[in-house]
Every structure is written in structure tokens, then in C-alpha cells.
């Protein structure tokens, strides 16, 4: 599996950096964003390092977005959000901070941005993130057993 030693996501995948995982399979991990826009903000990351979406095989891109959609359903169910944003940035000009492909699944609530701007990012403790992740994992468990995430 191709990894980059200076990449925070590769370090997390290898178990060398802390994270709060929501989901993991052979190809992807989903983890809580440490600085969430809203609580439940989850990052879906391929386990193989790709700098951007254009460097990923198309079949893997398709699987990533199918999984992102299913994770979004579990997130909405678990934290009672009103909607969600899927975000994926490619390159510095597009505000890609970590040069490892990832999809942001951001729960949204009616009136969470009354002035039309994004809500401010929060700083969440690992304990807070762990509680939210557990709730999301419970929402994944039933759909997973019925083939929902496969």
C-alpha cells in the first residue's frame, strides 16, 4: 500500500497518529474531523495515498462516493441533522490543505448559518469526537448488516 511518511492521513492509517475512526474497510477509513464545521463532520479517506481526485482510479472514486453517500445517511440519522454538504478539494487553489484525497461529510442544520457564511470551525476533544463517532457507528451497524454499505 503506497503511503507518504509526511502525510497526516497516511500516519493515521498506519496507526502512528491519533484519530477517532467511524468506519474502516480494506480501501477506506472514515474519521471525525478534529476541527469540525458542525459536530459529526466526518472525513472519508482512501487508505492508499493519492494527492488528488484526478490521480485516483475511476472505479475507486465511484466506490468512495457511494460510501460517502451511505455514511452521510448514517450521520444524518445519528445526529438528527437537517442536511449535509459533501466537499472535496483538489489543489492549493481549491483550498486542499492535506494533499491526500479526502471527502468532507458535513452535517448541516436549518439556521446554522443565518448570515449565509459557513459556521465557524470548532475545536473538539477526542472524548467529544468519540461520543459522536459511537453514535454514528451505531447508525452504521444495522445498514451494514443488511448490505447497506457494501
Residue ranges of model-derived segments:
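HIT superfamily nucleotide-processing domains
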Residues: 1-150
Amino acid at each position: 500500500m503506497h503511503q507518504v511518511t509526511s502525510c497526516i492521513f497516511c500516519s493515521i492509517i498506519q496507526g502512528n497518529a491519533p484519530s477517532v475512526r467511524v468506519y474502516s474497510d480494506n480501501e477506506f477509513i472514515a474519521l471525525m474531523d478534529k476541527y469540525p464545521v458542525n459536530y459529526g463532520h466526518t472525513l472519508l479517506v482512501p487508505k492508499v495515498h493519492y494527492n488528488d481526485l484526478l490521480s485516483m482510479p475511476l472505479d475507486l472514486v465511484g466506490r468512495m462516493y457511494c460510501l460517502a453517500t451511505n455514511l452521510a445517511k448514517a450521520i444524518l440519522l445519528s445526529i438528527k441533522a437537517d442536511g449535509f454538504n459533501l466537499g472535496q478539494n483538489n489543489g492549493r487553489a481549491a483550498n486542499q490543505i492535506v494533499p491526500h484525497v479526502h471527502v468532507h461529510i458535513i452535517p448541516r442544520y436549518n439556521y446554522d448559518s443565518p448570515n449565509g457564511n459557513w459556521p465557524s470551525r470548532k475545536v473538539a476533544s477526542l472524548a467529544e469526537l468519540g461520543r459522536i463517532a459511537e453514535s454514528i457507528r451505531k447508525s452504521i451497524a444495522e445498514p451494514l448488516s443488511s448490505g447497506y454499505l457494501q
